[in-house]
Amino acid sequence: MTNSQSDAALAAVLDRFDPSAGGPGAYDTPLGITNPPIDELLDRVSSKYALVIYAAKRARQINDYYNQLGEGILEYVGPLVEPGLQEKPLSIALREIHGDLLEHTEGE
């Protein structure tokens, strides 16, 4: 293999992992605290403290929903987005908030 061939092969491998070159990137985009971005979540509430309370309340509802499934009681609403495998209730709640799937009045 000549130098130019090895350089071309290396460039092809690098392009495969470069999202700006149309590749998927080295890693999938993680869900949860880093995705959706905090800045976009803060656009939906008045402060970071309101976001914490809002997300925590919804995560608690999702957790209670999963706990009640075995009892046959359907008092709580389940996730409004498709949960990922082993995805935590807080991550689900943040994705619901980001998707504007919930209505929230601050102070409640």
UniProtKB/Swiss-Prot annotation:
Family: Belongs to the RNA polymerase subunit omega family.
UniProt keyword Transmembrane helix present: no
NCBIfam families associated with the record: rpoZ
GO process terms (BP): DNA-templated transcription
GO cellular component term of the entry, any: DNA-directed RNA polymerase complex
Protein name: DNA-directed RNA polymerase subunit omega
Phylogenetic classification of the source organism: Bacteria, Bacillati, Actinomycetota, Actinomycetes, Mycobacteriales
UniProt keyword list: DNA-directed RNA polymerase, Nucleotidyltransferase, Transcription, Transferase
Gene name of the record: rpoZ
Catalysed reaction equations from the record: RNA(n) + a ribonucleoside 5'-triphosphate = RNA(n+1) + diphosphate
Superkingdom, natural source: Bacteria
Description of how the protein assembles with itself and partners: The RNAP catalytic core consists of 2 alpha, 1 beta, 1 beta' and 1 omega subunit. When a sigma factor is associated with the core the holoenzyme is formed, which can initiate transcription.
Annotated EC: 2.7.7.6
